[in-house]
């Protein structure tokens, strides 16, 4: 059986990637006629969802940056072996809301932790499984935070409480990753209206599937 494809959705907070992912599922099913599995990080499986609660709990204000990183890595490992790899081995198209690049952008560029150490931990946790395609949804930090503030349905988490400068560093980290990985990462202007962003993401995935 042909191995499925792993497509990751990345971007700073407020970029709208989660909404775009949800909108894409029926469009991709119609276009590709393939089983699609959607999931998220941190989370996706029971153990990883419990780790997610630890990471994002607004009361955990004393969490050390390295502790935060290692919790993300632990959640990633469990998620990979329990959900992502079985779906890929079954030949499915797997869409993941955040993956390895989030750690480099948030804990690396954002928190200032060593990028090489993070990349090593990512490789260790994933056994070298990289995305076949990554869609990076780029949005200015000010706009992203404004969207979060306006979204009354969104539950506030610990990272939402961070200052603007951290979100700006995260965005810079993502932009650097996009420049370093042009064959894998497709940058999408997420400051556009939702329909335009969905159309751009759909086109990128279909183009990749036909390559």
From Swiss-Prot:
Any one Gene Ontology molecular-function term assigned to this protein's record:
dTMP kinase activity
Query: What enzyme class is recorded for this protein?
Result: transferase
Under the heading PROSITE patterns, the entry gives: THYMIDYLATE_KINASE
**GO annotation, cellular component aspect:** cytosol
Where does the chain bind ATP?
11-18
| E.C. code | 2.7.4.9
The UniProt entry, under SUPFAM superfamilies, shows: P-loop containing nucleoside triphosphate hydrolases
- Identify the domain of life: Bacteria
User: Which GO BP terms, alphabetically?
Assistant: dTDP biosynthetic process; dTTP biosynthetic process; dUDP biosynthetic process
Keyword check for Manganese, yes or no. Answer: no
KW Hydrolase (keyword) present: no
Its UniProt entry gives the catalysed reaction(s) as: dTMP + ATP = dTDP + ADP
**Which CDD domains would you find in this protein's record?**
TMPK
State the UniProt keywords alphabetically.
Answer: ATP-binding, Kinase, Nucleotide biosynthesis, Nucleotide-binding, Transferase
Q: Main role? A: Phosphorylation of dTMP to form dTDP in both de novo and salvage pathways of dTTP synthesis.
Family from the record = Belongs to the thymidylate kinase family.
Checking HAMAP family in the record gives: Thymidylate_kinase
Protein name in the entry: Thymidylate kinase
Say which species the protein is native to: Streptococcus equi subsp. zooepidemicus (strain H70)
């Amino acid at each position: 059986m042909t191995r499925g494809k792993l497509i990751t959705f990345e971007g700073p907070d407020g970029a709208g990637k989660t909404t775009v992912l949800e909108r894409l599922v029926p469009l991709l099913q119609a276009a590709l006629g393939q089983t699609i599995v959607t999931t998220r990080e941190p989370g996706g499986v029971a153990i990883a969802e419990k780790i997610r609660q630890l990471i994002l709990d607004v009361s955990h204000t004393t969490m050390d940056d390295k502790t935060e990183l290692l919790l993300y890595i632990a959640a990633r490992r469990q998620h990979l072996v329990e959900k992502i790899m079985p779906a890929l081995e079954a030949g499915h198209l797997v869409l993941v809301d955040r993956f390895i690049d989030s750690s480099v952008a948030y804990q690396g560029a954002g928190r200032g932790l060593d990028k090489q150490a993070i990349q090593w931990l990512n490789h260790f946790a994933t056994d070298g499984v990289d995305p076949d395609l990554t869609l990076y949804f780029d949005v200015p930090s000010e706009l992203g935070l404004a969207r979060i503030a306006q979204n009354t349905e969104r539950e506030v988490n610990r990272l939402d409480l961070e200052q603007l400068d951290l979100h700006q560093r995260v965005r810079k980290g993502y932009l650097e990753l996009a420049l370093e990985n042009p064959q894998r990462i497709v940058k999408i202007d997420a400051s556009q209206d939702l329909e335009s962003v969905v159309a751009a993401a759909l086109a990128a995935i279909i183009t990749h599937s036909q390559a």
